[in-house]
Amino acid sequence: DFIQCFLKIEGYTTKAAWALTDALHLEAIRLIAKHLRGAVENTKEGREGMALGQYVAGMGFSNVGLGIVHSMAHPLSAYYDTPHGIANAVLLPYVMEFNAPETGEKFREIARAMGVKGVDDMSQDEYRKAAINAVRQLSKDVGIPEKLHSIGVQEKDLVSLSQDALKDVCTGGNPRNCTAEDILEIYRLAFK
């Protein structure tokens, strides 16, 4: 289930994250980045690696909560019956871009856990982009659409979606404070 990829990244960057949950989330990121493609191809190793990655991710995020990837995905499922994992997968790279200024060194560790080489030699901007690009590539490799319009989201609903997302329980855990206008802009970027 691709959603676990997002639970671990969101949990790792949430305001409530701490040393133990960071370790759990980084291990889950590593496992899922390594095994997701194989799981989609239905290999035994891929399925087993994903099962372990999902379990480890659950131990992490259940202790710290989530952020606006989930806040924004919940209304998509309510309005359009979009599968929750797909909604999260489409939104994650856009939310990562928004949250990057409030994540310190965490994107370096995300990039490293996802197998990006040379992160120690990268500037902050470079490793943040590398982490986001690694997520985008993994999504592409397993057939996740890049844009919201590809999953049936209608532009006329973006304002209402933004207002609903802002009220979601997960919003408070996001590492970067946001407004309905911020969320609307993220939806617009993900829509086009």
Predicted regions and their residues:
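Gly/Pro-rich interdomain helix-loop hinge
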Residues: 79-157
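Catalytic cores of large soluble enzymes that bind and process phosphate-bearing ligands
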Residues: 13, 17-24, 42, 64, ...
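Glycine-rich phosphate/pyrophosphate-binding beta-alpha loops
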Residues: 55-88, 168-173
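Short alpha-helical scaffolding segments that buttress acidic/His motifs in well-ordered protein cores
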Residues: 3, 28, 50-58, 72, ...
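Charged catalytic carboxylate motif
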Residues: 31, 49, 130, 134, ...
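Carboxylate- and glycine-rich phosphate/diphosphate-binding segment that chelates Mg2+/Mn2+
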Residues: 1-64
